[in-house]
Amino acid sequence: MVSYFVRYRGASPSPEAFETYYESQHAAILKQFPNIRSLILHRPSPWTDPFRVRRGETMLLAQMRFDSANDLDKALHSQARRLARDDFHRFPPFEGEVTHEAMTGKVIF
């Protein structure tokens, strides 16, 4: 399994509008990626930790799953990817950093 992560680290004046747009508009484009298995959206969740840790500042983390690196490469070179990149300019306001990363997953338990 290969996952492609897109991390939105920062803030939006309206996180709800950003997430709604992503789910209702952008996800429909991502669904057109060849051989995509799933799209999982991760949002911040309240949590407590008895130890001092550095908290992240991720507003939204999108995880797209593929069976192989070859499937991911096909998706990244597809017309749907170009449409997704164009759609990014229509997102609600967001200030921060967007990073992209592919990782191979291994289920341990």
Where are the regions a protein language model picked out?
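Macromolecular interaction modules
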Residues: 1-109
